[in-house]
Regions:
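Short, Lys/Arg-enriched N-terminal segments with co-localized hydrophobic residues
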Residues: 1-13
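A glycine- and small/hydrophobic-rich beta-loop-beta segment
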Residues: 300, 320-343, 368-376, 383-411
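Glycine-rich, N-terminal phosphate-binding loop and its surrounding beta-alpha-beta segment
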Residues: 56-58, 62-128
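Flexible, glycine/charged-enriched surface loops at secondary-structure junctions
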Residues: 51-61, 73-75, 155-158, 214-217, ...
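Catalytic-core signal marking the mid-to-C-terminal active-site face
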Residues: 15-18, 28-41, 49-66, 386-499
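N-terminal small/glycine-rich loop or linker at the start of catalytic domains
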Residues: 35-37, 41-44, 108-130, 330-342
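Helix-rich catalytic cores of soluble enzyme domains
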Residues: 132-364, 368
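Short beta-alpha connecting loops at secondary-structure transitions
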Residues: 23-27, 306-312, 340-347, 375-387
Length: 499
C-alpha cells in the first residue's frame, strides 16, 4: 500500500485508456425557455443590427446577397433575415468525426459526447529546465505533441503554441509536420492565409495517402477566427473557412467575445452576441458548400475590469462554456468550446482549482470538443510541458465523473456481500480483484497517495516537480510514432521544413 505507482512515462497499467466519448449533460446552466430566448435575441441582432465586414470579401458578399441577405455597401453592413439563417443551419451535419491516423483516437462529435484536448497559440513556454518563460518555438510543438501522444486522457492535439523561429510563408506547413511527426491523434490547426491552407492540405494529403483519402477521413481540421467580436467578419479567416468547406475539411468556427470589452458585461448578452456570430459563420459555410462539417465554436470569456486583461480563470468562464453546448445543441450542431484556462503563471494551486472547475463544468455540460483543457497558463499566453501531465489527470477525473455509477447485479455485489458475511473484509474477495482496476480512477501516477515517510524518502517532490520528471522521461523515450521515410522524404522535397 505504501509503494509509489508506476508513472505513466514508464507504462501504467492502471491508467484509464480511451477516456473520451462519455456522455455529459448533467449540468445545464440554461433552462429551455432561456435557450430559446437567447436564440431569438441572436436572430433579432442579425436582422436588425447586422454584421460589418472588412474589405476583400466581394465574392462572399455576392453569395450572401444572392441568398437573400441585405447588404448596405455604403456602411459595410450585412443584415440576415431569420429565414436565411434557419434554412442554412439546417444543412449543417449533426455529427462530425475527426479522424486519427491509427483509428484508435477517432473523435465522434455528436449529442452530449465529450472529448478534451489541447489548444492555444501561446507565445511563451515555461521552460522545464529553468522554470522561466521563454519564446516558444517549433521544437516545442513537436515535444508537446510527443507528451500528448502518451497521455490517454488528452484526446486530440490542437497546435498549442507559436513557432517564433519559423517564417510566415512556411509557418503552417512546418507546424503540421512537427505535430504529425509527434502523434497519431487528430490535429487541429489554423492557417495564415489561403496559400498556407493549400500547403497544409497538400501536406496532409501526402500523409493520408492522397487528397481523396484525406477527404474521406480528414486527419486534420481547421480553426478559423472568422468573427472579430463584436459582429465583424475577418476577411482572411472567412476565406480560409470557405476554402476548408469546399474541401470538406472540418471547420471550428471560433468566436471569442470578452464580456465587458468585446461583448456586453452580462453573460446573457455575451451569449446572445456570440450565438449571432456563430449563426453567421454556419450560414456562410453552408452556403459555400452544403453539408460541410462544421463545429459551433463559441469561446465566451470576460475581461478583468481591474486590468482589462483576459480573465481566464473565472468561474463564469466554465458556466458560459457549458451554456455554449446547449445553444449548439438547440440548432443540432456539434460544438467546440473551451475549459482549463487559468490566470496562474506557473503550475500551482491556483492553476489547479481554476482548471478543474472550468473543465468539470464544460464536461458535465456535454460539450463535444473542449480545447484549452490541457497545458495552458497565464490566460492562454503560456504553456508548460509539466502542465500537460497534471491536466491529463484532471481530465481523467472529469471523464470518471461522466462515466457515473453503474448499478446492476454485478456492481450491487449481493453475492460478494453474502460470501464475505458480517464482520469479514473484502481485501481478498474475487469481486474486489475483478473491479479494483476499473471502479475507481487510478490516474497517470501524478497524484501522490503514498505515506509521508515514503514520500520524504523519495525526495519530497511536489506535484510540479513530479510532473516535470514524468514529462522529461516521456521525451527521453523513443517516440511512439514517426512518419515513414518515404512520406517524410516527399514532404521535405515539397516543403521547406525547418525541424
Amino acid at each position: 500500500l505504501g509503494e509509489a505507482p508506476e508513472i505513466l512515462a514508464e507504462g501504467n497499467e492502471m491508467g484509464n485508456k480511451n477516456s473520451g466519448g462519455h456522455s455529459g449533460g448533467q449540468y445545464r446552466p440554461l433552462k429551455p425557455e432561456q435557450i430559446e430566448r437567447i436564440h431569438q435575441a441572436a436572430l433579432s441582432i442579425l436582422e436588425n443590427i447586422g454584421f460589418t465586414y472588412e474589405q476583400g470579401l466581394d465574392d462572399t458578399l455576392t453569395m450572401l446577397e444572392d441568398a437573400g441577405a441585405k447588404i448596405d455597401h455604403a456602411h459595410s453592413r450585412i443584415y440576415f433575415p431569420p429565414d436565411l439563417i434557419l434554412s442554412q443551419i439546417a444543412n449543417a451535419p449533426q455529427q462530425v468525426i475527426l479522424y486519427s491516423r491509427d483509428a484508435q483516437n477517432d473523435i465522434d462529435l455528436r449529442d452530449d459526447r465529450v472529448y478534451m484536448g489541447t489548444g492555444g497559440m501561446a507565445v511563451t513556454v515555461v521552460d522545464i529546465e529553468t522554470g522561466q518563460a521563454r519564446e516558444s518555438c517549433l521544437q516545442d510543438i513537436y515535444n508537446i505533441g510527443r507528451i500528448v501522444d502518451r497521455l490517454d486522457n488528452i484526446h486530440f492535439y490542437l497546435r498549442p503554441c507559436t513557432a517564433h523561429d519559423v517564417p510566415a510563408s512556411i509557418y503552417d506547413a512546418n507546424c503540421m509536420y512537427a505535430a504529425m511527426q509527434a502523434t497519431n491523434k487528430h490535429y487541429m490547426t489554423g492557417a495564415i492565409d489561403r496559400q498556407s491552407f493549400r500547403d497544409i492540405l497538400t501536406l496532409a494529403s501526402i500523409v493520408a495517402g492522397n487528397e481523396k483519402k484525406l477527404a474521406e477521413k480528414p486527419i486534420f481540421s481547421l480553426i478559423t477566427c472568422f468573427a472579430i467580436s463584436p459582429l465583424k467578419l475577418c476577411t482572411q479567416s472567412t476565406l480560409n473557412m470557405q476554402e476548408a468547406c469546399r474541401h470538406r475539411i472540418p471547420v471550428a468556427l471560433s468566436s471569442a467575445p470578452m464580456a465587458g470589452s468585446t461583448s456586453p458585461m452580462t453573460m446573457a448578452g455575451t451569449l446572445a452576441q456570440l450565438h449571432a456570430e456563430e449563426l453567421v459563420g454556419l450560414t456562410i459555410g453552408q452556403l459555400t458548400h452544403p453539408g460541410a462539417p462544421m463545429l459551433y465554436g463559441g469561446i465566451p470569456g470576460s475581461a478583468n475590469m481591474r486590468t482589462m486583461g483576459y480573465q481566464g480563470g473565472a468561474v463564469e468562464f466554465g458556466m458560459m462554456n457549458a451554456a455554449i453546448h446547449q445553444l449548439a445543441a438547440h440548432i443540432n450542431v456539434p460544438n467546440y468550446n473551451s475549459s482549463g484556462l487559468t490566470d496562474a503563471k506557473i503550475p500551482d494551486a491556483q492553476a489547479g482549482w481554476e482548471k478543474a472547475f472550468s473543465s468539470l463544468l464544460a464536461a458535465m455540460g456535454g460539450s463535444n470538443y473542449i480545447h484549452h483543457a490541457a497545458g495552458m497558463l497565464e490566460s492562454m499566453l503560456a504553456v508548460a510541458y509539466e502542465q500537460y501531465i497534471i491536466d491529463d489527470e484532471i481530465i481523467g477525473m472529469c471523464a470518471r465523473v461522466l462515466e457515473g455509477i453503474i448499478v446492476d447485479d454485478e456492481h450491487l455485489a449481493i453475492e460478494a456481500i453474502a460470501d464475505v458475511g458480517p464482520g469479514g473484509n473484502y481485501l481478498m474477495s474475487p469481486h474486489t480483484l475483478a473491479h479494483m482496476r476499473s471502479e475507481f480512477f487510478a490516474g497517470n501516477g501524478i497524484t501522490d497517495g503514498r505515506f509521508r515517510d515514503i514520500w520524504v524518502a523519495d525526495g519530497s517532490l511536489d506535484t510540479r516537480e513530479r510532473a516535470q520528471e514524468m514529462a522529461q522521461k516521456i521525451l527521453e523515450r523513443d517516440p511512439c510514432f514517426k512518419l515513414d521515410k518515404r512520406t517524410e522524404k516527399r514532404i521535405r522535397n515539397d516543403f521547406d521544413i525547418r525541424m
